Structure formats: C-alpha cells, structure tokens
C-alpha cells in the first residue's frame, strides 16, 4: 500500500520529534555524567542500595561483547548500525499501528544515541549500574533503555495485532457459518404443510 504524501510527511514529522527528543535526552545525560565523573577515576555515585552511577566506556557491543576486537570492529559497528537504523526507519514509516510507530521510534532514538557516541567518541559511554548483593547487571545507558523499551512495545504490538487478526478471522468464520446455514434453510425444499 502506497502512503499518501501528507501521511508520509506527518509520520516523518512525528517520528523525527520523538527520535530527536530521545537522542537529546540520551546525549545530555551522557554529557553530564562524563563531565561530572571523568575527573574522579573510579568514583561511583551510590544512588540507592541497588543502583550506582559509574564512568564506563564500552568499546564493544551490548554488555561489552567483542571489546577485545575494538580496533577492527568499530568501523564495522558504525556501518552495520547505520544500515540497521535506516532499515528500522523504513519499517517505522510502513507501520500501521501506534505501537509499531512508538516502538520503532524508541529503538531508532536509542540506536542513534549510541551511534553518535561511537562516531564522535570512539566508544559508547555507559553509566547506569544495577546490582543486588553478588549479582551485578552490565552497565548501560539511557539509549539502551530506549532500545529495550522500544523492543518491548514492538513485541506487545505484534501480539496485540496477532490477537486482533485471530479474533477477526474467528468472527468472519462464524459469520460465514451463519450465512451458510441461513442459505441452506432458504434453499431447502418446502414441506407439504407449508402449502396450506
């Protein structure tokens, strides 16, 4: 289905506002923590009994994977992430649901936030650290939160759409069954009692 120019423009304008807002929030929080933690190496700001703010650079991908191959992988990450963002933007523009639109906007906003870090700083800045007793979750940032939230929205949207399709299919099946029975009754030969 081809989108009208007006609908395409409105979708682009709305998505751009959401994405730019998420990128600004991500970059401002990173800027603040970089500027307030970098002069204090090893400093951990204890926020609660399970949350710290720390100064960490991630040279790999999610959860620090592939950080040992940084010199080879950074350009590959940049190219791959750019292609993925473009493809996600295409999917978002094709989305027919608010959940799809919102989910893709969050994923794209988070991905662009981390892409900016990798492009201009050579690594992604992470600062949020959750832990509980001996368990420690990998350090992450707001862009990662946006991506995760976007994926959750997309999964929920997918299952809602699937449920709606199944309900409509059942409803259409039931209607077809009723119409078939009514047609049988209309076409059934009339008995002798009806001739009176």
UniProtKB/Swiss-Prot annotation:
Pathway: Protein modification; lipoprotein biosynthesis (signal peptide cleavage). InterPro entries: Peptidase_A8. Coiled coil: none annotated. This protein specifically catalyzes the removal of signal peptides from prolipoproteins. Belongs to the peptidase A8 family. The lineage of its organism: Bacteria, Pseudomonadati, Pseudomonadota, Alphaproteobacteria, Rickettsiales. It comes from Rickettsia bellii (strain OSU 85-389). GO terms for biological process: proteolysis. It comes from the Bacteria. The active site is at 126, 144. The chain crosses the membrane at residues 75-95, 97-117, 135-155. This is Lipoprotein signal peptidase. The keyword Transmembrane helix applies. It is found in: Cell inner membrane. It catalyses: Release of signal peptides from bacterial membrane prolipoproteins. Hydrolyzes -Xaa-Yaa-Zaa-|-(S,diacylglyceryl)Cys-, in which Xaa is hydrophobic (preferably Leu), and Yaa (Ala or Ser) and Zaa (Gly or Ala) have small, neutral side chains. GO terms for molecular function: aspartic-type endopeptidase activity. PANTHER family: LIPOPROTEIN SIGNAL PEPTIDASE. It is an enzyme of class 3 (hydrolase). The keyword Zinc does not apply. One of its GO terms (cellular component) is plasma membrane. Keywords: Aspartyl protease, Cell inner membrane, Cell membrane, Hydrolase, Membrane, Protease, Transmembrane, Transmembrane helix. HAMAP family: LspA. Its EC number is 3.4.23.36. It is a multi-pass membrane protein.
């Amino acid at each position: 289905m081809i989108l009208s120019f007006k609908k395409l423009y409105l979708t682009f304008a709305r998505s751009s506002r959401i994405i730019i807002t998420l990128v600004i929030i991500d970059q401002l929080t990173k800027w603040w923590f970089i500027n307030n933690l970098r002069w204090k190496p090893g400093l951990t700001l204890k926020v609660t009994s399970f949350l710290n703010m720390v100064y960490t650079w991630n040279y790999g991908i999610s959860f620090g994977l592939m950080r040992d191959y940084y010199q080879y992988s950074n350009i590959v990450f940049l190219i791959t992430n750019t292609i993925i963002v473009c493809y996600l933007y295409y999917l978002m523009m094709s989305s027919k649901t608010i959940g799809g639109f919102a989910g893709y906007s969050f994923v794209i906003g988070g991905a662009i936030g981390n892409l900016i870090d990798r492009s201009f700083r050579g690594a992604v800045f992470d600062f949020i650290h959750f832990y509980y007793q001996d368990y420690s979750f990998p350090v992450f940032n707001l862009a990662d939160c946006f991506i995760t939230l976007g994926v959750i929205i997309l999964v929920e949207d997918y299952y809602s759409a699937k449920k709606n399709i199944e309900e409509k299919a059942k409803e259409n099946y039931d209607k077809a069954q009723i119409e078939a029975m009514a047609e049988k009754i209309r076409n059934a030969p009339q008995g002798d009692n009806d001739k009176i």
